[in-house]
Curated annotation (Swiss-Prot):
Homotrimer. UDP-N-acetyl-alpha-D-glucosamine binds at residues 9-12, 23, 73, 78-79, 140, 155, 170, 228, 333, 351, 366, 377. One of its GO terms (molecular function) is magnesium ion binding. Residues 231-251 are annotated as: Linker. The active site is at H363. The gene is glmU. It comes from Heliobacterium modesticaldum (strain ATCC 51547 / Ice1). Its EC number is 2.7.7.23, 2.3.1.157. InterPro entries: Bifunctional_GlmU (IPR005882), GlmU-like (IPR050065), GlmU_C_LbH (IPR038009), Hexapep (IPR001451), Hexapep_transf_CS (IPR018357), MobA-like_NTP_Trfase (IPR025877), Nucleotide-diphossugar_trans (IPR029044), Trimer_LpxA-like_sf (IPR011004). GO terms for cellular component: cytoplasm; membrane. In the N-terminal section; belongs to the N-acetylglucosamine-1-phosphate uridyltransferase family. In the C-terminal section; belongs to the transferase hexapeptide repeat family. This is Bifunctional protein GlmU.
C-alpha cells in the first residue's frame, strides 16, 4: 500500500451560514461536520490528517485537538493556495495525498477508500471524485477526452454555454501523486474570474506534462453535498439521519415512526429495542437489548441496560440498570445511577444519586445528592432537602426503608435500614434502623366551624 495522508480544507468563512462559529464546527447528527470527515479518513487508515485552518482556526484546533495537525491559511486565496499552505506539513515519505473539504460530512469511508484504490491502481498523477447529477448549476464541470480520461475541470463562472450543459461535476475530493501535485502547484496562477489559485488547475498541468488524470464516479450523489447555508445543513442532517435509522433497523431495532426519531452518530442501540415516536438519542448513549424507549423521550450520554422502559422522559448523563422502568415524565439529571429493577415514576426528578436494586420512587418526588439502598419505597411528594443556601448535603436511605408520602428529608441525614417515616414528616435528625419516625403537628378538629363562621359574618 502507498503511504498516504490527507489535507482537509477548513479555512473558509462560511458567510452564508450567518454565524460567528466556524462553518465546519456546525453540527450534523450531533457532532461537527468536520468530525464526520475525520471519521471517514480514520476508516481509511489516516489517523492524523492535515487540516488547513483560517477563519475561526483556533476554535477548530481546540475542538479537534490532536486528531489532526494544522496549517494556517491567513488569506483565503483559493483551494490551490490552501494546499500550498499545507505543503510543509506533508511528510517526505508520503506518496499519495488526498485533498477534500471539511464541509462534506456525508462522504463515507468506503467512498474514500474506493477513490484511493482507483488512483493507486491507475498510476495516475491525479484522480477526481465525480458525480452525474440532474442540476449541475454551481459545480465545476468535468471535461474528458475521447478515451474517457479527465482533461480539465472548468468552474461554473469560467464555463462557456456548451460546458455548462455537462452533467458530470467535480465533487471536490481528489487523490494526487505527492511529487506531481507540489510541482504543479508551483506553476498555477490566479488568472480566472475569482482571482484565486484553483486546485483544479493542476489537472490541466498534469496533462500538459504527459500525466494521466482519471475519475472515480460516485453512485450516491448525496455524498457530495457540501454545506454552505443553514438549508444545506438541514439537508445533510436529513440524509445522515436516514442512514442512521436504516443502520439501526438493519441491526434489529424497531422504529415505530422512523422520521421522528433522531440519533447521534456515536449512539449505540441493542437488538429488539423498540423506539417510539419523537425520541432523541444524543451523545455517546448506549442502549441495551429489548428496551422500549419513548414516545417523546430524550436520552443524552447515558448507558441504558437491557429490558428497560423509558416513557416521555429526559435522561442526561445517567446510568440505568437492567429491568428498570422510568416515567412517564421523569427527569434524570447528570450523575444518576439506577441499579437493577428500579422504578422511577411520573414527575420524579433525580440528580446525582444512586438508587439501589428494586427500589421505587413512584411519583412526584425530588431526590438529589442521595444514596438509596435496595428495596426502598419513597412515597409521593418526598423531597430530599439537599441545599442549605450555600452547600449541598447528602441524604442516605438504607435498605428496606419506607418513606411516607409528603416527607421532607433535610440533609445531611440518614434513614436506617427498614426504618419507617410517617407521612407528612419533616426529618432533621438521623433515624435508627428499624425505627418509626413521625414529625408533624397533632390533628385538631373543630366541629361546626363552618357554621359559626357563616353566622358571624351575618
Amino acid at each position: 500500500m502507498h503511504k498516504r495522508t490527507a489535507v482537509v480544507l477548513a479555512a473558509g468563512k462560511g458567510t452564508r451560514m450567518k454565524s460567528r462559529q466556524p462553518k465546519v464546527l456546525h453540527e450534523v447528527a450531533g457532532q461537527p461536520m468536520i468530525c464526520h470527515v475525520l471519521d471517514a479518513l480514520t476508516d481509511c487508515g489516516v489517523a492524523q490528517p492535515i487540516v488547513v485552518i483560517g477563519h475561526g482556526g483556533e476554535a477548530v484546533r481546540q475542538r479537534l485537538g490532536d486528531r489532526a495537525c494544522y496549517a494556517w491559511q491567513q488569506e483565503q486565496l483559493g483551494t490551490g493556495h490552501a494546499v500550498m499552505m499545507a505543503r510543509p506539513e506533508v511528510p517526505e515519505e508520503v506518496e499519495t495525498v488526498m485533498v477534500l473539504c471539511g464541509d462534506t460530512p456525508l462522504l463515507t469511508g468506503a467512498t474514500l477508500s474506493a477513490l484511493w484504490e482507483t488512483h493507486e491502481q491507475s498510476g495516475a498523477m491525479g484522480t477526481v471524485l465525480t458525480a452525474v447529477i440532474d442540476d449541475p448549476k454551481g459545480y465545476g464541470r468535468i471535461l474528458r477526452d475521447d478515451a474517457g480520461h479527465v482533461t480539465a475541470i472548468v468552474e461554473e463562472k469560467d464555463a462557456d454555454e456548451k460546458q455548462k450543459t455537462i452533467r458530470e461535476i467535480n465533487a471536490g475530493t481528489y487523490c494526487f501523486d505527492r511529487a506531481a501535485l507540489f510541482a504543479a502547484l508551483d506553476a498555477i496562477t490566479p488568472a480566472n474570474a475569482q482571482g484565486e489559485y484553483y486546485l483544479t488547475d493542476v489537472l490541466a498541468i498534469f496533462r500538459q506534462r504527459g500525466g494521466l488524470v482519471v475519475a472515480h464516479t460516485l453512485q450516491d450523489e448525496r455524498e457530495i453535498l457540501g454545506i454552505n447555508s443553514r438549508v444545506q445543513l438541514a439537508e445533510a442532517e436529513a440524509v445522515l439521519q436516514d442512514r442512521l435509522r436504516r443502520k439501526w433497523m438493519d441491526a434489529g431495532v424497531t422504529l415505530i415512526d422512523p422520521p421522528s426519531v433522531f440519533f447521534h452518530t456515536k449512539a449505540v442501540v441493542g437488538a429488539d429495542t423498540i423506539i417510539y415516536p419523537q425520541t432523541i438519542i444524543e451523545g455517546e448513549t448506549v442502549i441495551g437489548e429489548g428496551c422500549r424507549i419513548g414516545p417523546a423521550t430524550r436520552i443524552c450520554d447515558s448507558r441504558i441496560g437491557e429490558n428497560v422502559v423509558i416513557q416521555n422522559s429526559v435522561v442526561l448523563d445517567s446510568r440505568i440498570g437492567d429491568d428498570c422502568a422510568v416515567g412517564p415524565f421523569a427527569y434524570l439529571r447528570p450523575g444518576t445511577c439506577l441499579a437493577e429493577a428500579v422504578k422511577v415514576g411520573d414527575f420524579v426528578e433525580i440528580k446525582k444519586s444512586v438508587i439501589g436494586k428494586g427500589s421505587k420512587v413512584p411519583h412526584l418526588s425530588y431526590v438529589g445528592d442521595a444514596t438509596v439502598g435496595e428495596d426502598v419505597n419513597i412515597g409521593a411528594g418526598t423531597i430530599t432537602c439537599n441545599y442549605d443556601g450555600k452547600h449541598k448535603h447528602v441524604t442516605a436511605i438504607e435498605d428496606g426503608a419506607f418513606i411516607g408520602s409528603n416527607t421532607n428529608l433535610v440533609a445531611p441525614v440518614t434513614v436506617g435500614a427498614h426504618a419507617l417515616i410517617g407521612a407528612g414528616s419533616t426529618i432533621t435528625k438521623d433515624v435508627p434502623a428499624g425505627a418509626l419516625a413521625v414529625e408533624r403537628s397533632r390533628m385538631k378538629i373543630k366541629e361546626n366551624f363552618l357554621g359559626r363562621k357563616h353566622k358571624g359574618s351575618q
